[in-house]
UniProtKB/Swiss-Prot annotation:
Catalysed reactions, semicolon-separated: heme b + 2 H(+) = protoporphyrin IX + Fe(2+)
First-tier enzyme category under EC: lyase
Ribonucleoprotein as UniProt keyword: no
Record has Iron as a keyword: yes
Signal peptide positions on this chain: none
Keywords: Cytoplasm, Heme biosynthesis, Iron, Lyase, Metal-binding, Porphyrin biosynthesis
GO MF annotations in UniProt: ferrochelatase activity; metal ion binding
GO cellular component: cytoplasm
Pathway assignment: Porphyrin-containing compound metabolism; protoheme biosynthesis; protoheme from protoporphyrin-IX: step 1/1
Protein name: Ferrochelatase
Length: 371
C-alpha cells in the first residue's frame, strides 16, 4: 500500500502541537442528493449499525437512502443557517466557531497550539484535516471528540478513522485521545452556566407547581448497553451532576433519549413519548436541554425545538422552552480549554525561539541539508 506523500521537510521548522475537535458530521448542502450521500456514508459505518453487511447494504441502498433522503433534506433545510456571518449547517458553523474561539483563548494564554475541527462523516473530513495539520508542522495531535459521553457508535468510530489515516502516514505524529468528559467539572460547569443564563433571561420553571426540565440525550440501541457500552451510565451521571449543580431534586428533571431509528428497542425513556405524556397530564411548562450535544444540530433544532415542541403542545402542554446547546459560549470555550490542557500535560506548548530554529537550520545546512 503506498503511503501518503509527506510535506516537504525544512530544518528549523518548529514542531507544533494540535487539538483536533471531532464531531459527527453533516451534509454539504440541503439537496436530496447531498443528504443521501451523507446518510449513505454515516449509516454504512459498522460501528453505527451492527447488522450483517450484505443484508444492511440492501436495506440502506435500496430502501433507506432512496426513501428518506428527500424528507431528511427538508428537515435540514428548515434549520440551515443563511445569515451573513453564519451560513451553512449549524453543526459545522458552531464547530468552526468553537475551534476558532479555542485557538484564540489558548494563544492568549501563551500556548502555541493549532486547533482544527473535523467531521467523521462529510466535510471537513478527518483525513483532509490531519493532512493539513501535518503541512503546518504538527508533530503531536490531541484528538478530542465532541462527544461528552463515550459510545462505540460515536467516539470509537472517530478514533477508528484517525487510526486508519495514521496507518497511511509514513511519518506519523504523536497521538493522544480524550475518551470522554461526561463528569469533568469544566463540562458540568459550562452546562450549569448555559441553563442558568437561559433562566436568568427567560425566567425559570416553577418546579414547585410541576414544571419539568427534560435532559434529552441521543439514543442508542439497548443492545449496546447489554454488550458493554458505557454510554447509558455516563448520560445518567451527567444528568445527575447537572441536576445537583442546578439545585434540583430528582423528579424535577428527567433524563430521556431521542432519535430512535428502526424497530429495535433503544435506551429509554424515549424523549418524544415523555413530552407527549407531560403535555397530556397538563404540565404547564417544560424546558428541554440536550447536554450530550455540545453544538446545535438537526437533532436539537428540528427534532427537539420544532417537533418536540409540537408534540408537547398538541398533547395539551402549554409553555415549551428549548435551551440552546453550549455552542461557542464563553463558559464552554473555557471548559474545552481546561479539558484539553489537562490532556496536553508534558507536551511542549510554547513556540521555539526563532534564534534556536535558525541555529538548527544552519547546522543542518552545514552538514549538506538542502533546506
Amino acid at each position: 500500500m503506498p503511503f501518503l506523500p509527506e510535506p516537504l521537510f525544512q530544518h528549523g521548522q518548529p514542531d507544533r502541537t494540535a487539538i483536533l475537535l471531532v464531531n459527527l458530521g453533516t451534509p454539504d448542502g440541503t439537496s436530496p442528493r447531498e443528504v443521501g450521500r451523507y446518510l449513505r456514508q454515516f449509516l454504512s459505518d459498522p460501528r453505527v449499525v451492527e447488522i450483517p453487511r450484505a443484508v444492511w447494504w440492501f436495506i440502506l441502498n435500496v430502501l433507506i437512502v432512496p426513501l428518506r433522503s428527500r424528507a431528511s433534506a427538508h428537515k435540514y433545510e428548515s434549520i440551515w443557517l443563511r445569515e451573513a456571518n453564519m451560513t451553512g449547517s449549524p453543526l459545522l458553523v458552531y464547530s468552526e466557531r468553537q475551534a476558532h474561539a479555542l485557538q484564540q483563548l489558548l494563544n492568549a494564554q501563551g500556548h502555541d497550539v493549532v486547533v482544527a475541527c473535523a467531521m467523521r462523516y462529510g466535510n471537513p473530513s478527518i483525513p483532509s484535516v490531519m493532512q493539513a495539520l501535518r503541512k503546518q508542522g504538527v508533530e503531536r495531535i490531541l484528538v478530542l471528540p465532541m462527544y461528552p459521553q463515550y459510545s462505540g457508535t460515536t467516539t470509537a468510530t472517530a478514533f477508528d478513522e484517525v487510526f486508519r489515516v495514521l496507518g497511511e502516514m509514513r511519518n506519523q505524529p504523536e497521538l493522544r485521545l480524550v475518551k470522554h468528559f461526561h463528569d469533568d467539572p469544566a463540562y458540568i460547569n459550562a452546562l450549569h452556566q448555559q441553563v442558568g443564563a437561559y433562566w436568568a433571561q427567560h425566567g425559570a420553571p416553577d418546579f414547585a407547581h410541576g414544571d419539568k426540565l427534560v435532559l434529552s440525550f441521543h439514543g442508542v440501541p439497548r443492545r449496546t448497553l447489554e454488550l458493554g457500552d458505557p454510554y447509558h451510565c455516563e448520560c445518567l451521571k451527567t444528568g445527575r451532576l447537572l441536576g445537583e449543580a442546578l439545585g434540583l431534586q430528582p423528579g424535577q428533571y428527567l433524563v430521556t433519549f431521542q432519535s430512535r431509528f428502526g424497530r429495535a428497542e433503544w435506551l429509554q425513556p424515549y424523549t418524544a413519548p415523555t413530552l407527549e405524556e407531560l403535555g397530556r397530564v397538563g404540565t404547564n411548562r417544560v424546558d428541554v436541554f440536550c447536554p450530550g450535544f455540545p453544538a446545535d444540530c438537526l437533532e436539537t433544532l428540528e427534532e427537539i425545538a420544532m417537533e418536540g415542541q409540537s408534540t408537547f403542545r398538541v398533547a395539551g402542554g402549554k409553555e415549551f422552552h428549548y435551551i440552546p446547546c453550549l455552542n461557542d459560549s464563553e463558559a464552554w470555550i473555557a471548559g474545552i480549554a481546561d479539558i484539553a490542557l489537562a490532556h496536553l500535560q508534558g507536551w511542549p506548548l510554547t513556540l521555539t525561539h526563532p534564534h534556536v530554529l535558525e541555529a538548527s537550520r544552519t547546522r543542518a545546512q552545514s552538514k549538506g541539508a538542502a533546506a
